[in-house]
C-alpha cells in the first residue's frame, strides 16, 4: 500500500517517465507546491539520497528518502506549512476546490469523484472539508 503510494508520488516527480528524478523535475514539483528552491538547494536535496552518485534519484533512492522523512516525522511547522499550501483562502479548511487546485498544479488530473473521495477519506466530522486536525 505504502510502496504503491510512493510509486505514485515518484511518477508525479518523474515528468518524462524515464525512471529518474532530475533537479529540473524536482524543482518543477516544488515550485508547483509554492516553494522556491535555488538550483544549489535542489542539487543538495538530490545529493542527499543519490546513492550511486549519478546526479538523479531513481525509485529505490526515492524510497530511502521517503523512509528518512517518515522517520523524523515532519515537524509541526512543516505539517502546518503543507496545510497552508492546500488551504488557499486561509480559512482553516481545505475544500474540494482547493484540493483539486493543488493536485492539478502537481499535474494530477483528478475527476470530481476522486477529489470528493479524498476529502471523504480525511473528513472525520462530515462537514465536507478537511480541517487541520483531520489533515494531520
From Swiss-Prot:
Ca(2+) 3 binds at residues 87, 89, 91, 93, 98. SUPFAM superfamilies: EF-hand (SSF47473). The keyword Repeat applies. Ca(2+) 4 binds at residues 123, 125, 127, 129, 134. Residues 1-36, 37-72, 74-109, 110-136 form the EF-hand domain. PROSITE patterns: EF_HAND_1 (PS00018), EF_HAND_2 (PS50222). The keyword Endoplasmic reticulum does not apply. Keywords: Calcium, Metal-binding, Methylation, Repeat. Ca(2+) 1 binds at residues 14, 16, 18, 20, 25. GO terms for cellular component: centrosome; cytoplasm; myelin sheath. Calmodulin acts as part of a calcium signal transduction pathway by mediating the control of a large number of enzymes, ion channels, aquaporins and other proteins through calcium-binding. Calcium-binding is required for the activation of calmodulin. Among the enzymes to be stimulated by the calmodulin-calcium complex are a number of protein kinases, such as myosin light-chain kinases and calmodulin-dependent protein kinase type II (CaMK2), and phosphatases. Belongs to the calmodulin family. This is Calmodulin-A. It comes from Oryzias latipes. The gene is calm1.
